[in-house]
Amino acid sequence: MNPRFEAAWELHIFLTEHHIAYAIIGGVAAQHWGEQRFTQDVDMTIATSPADDIEQVVTLLTHRFRSRVSNPVEFARLRRMILLTAGNNVDVDVSLALPGYEDDLLARAVDFVPEIGKAIRLCTAEDLIIHKTVAGRPQDLSDIQSIVFRQAEKLDLTYIREWLRQFAEIMEQPELPERFESAWRKRTAA
């Protein structure tokens, strides 16, 4: 099995044992929904709530997986991220989900089977597009285009556009939806 899938499977087992909902986001999901490309790590988001004790969540994860930062609790409080290393030395970036949009992302996640008998949870193509549109880095924009080309008519455009509209408003970035719309126009013009 691919080392990133091995790391994702290891996290899947642990999170499932602890009844923590999760979804793989980032490059691993982009490979599934878009084109194959190189990625060195695994990105995921896990279910948390404002009432969750961040220290407790961080301690649970860092008791099993090695932290890549010296003070993981403080790092998680500041960035809502936990930087871990799986048993096979693959880096895993764990985002602590916020209520609202990420509740939808986790509820909509789908099973992906990289190897018979081993299913991991991936965010949907729509949610990956939303994540990558908000991030807006050059690789993200390339991923959006490849997902649009590959998934095309399967995409729930209403869902994507509504969440991007909300993020544009919250982030005060009215140009945000255009990152997706540009990719969509290129697809239909091809």
Model-flagged regions — what are they?
Residues M1-A190:
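Compositionally biased terminal segments of proteins
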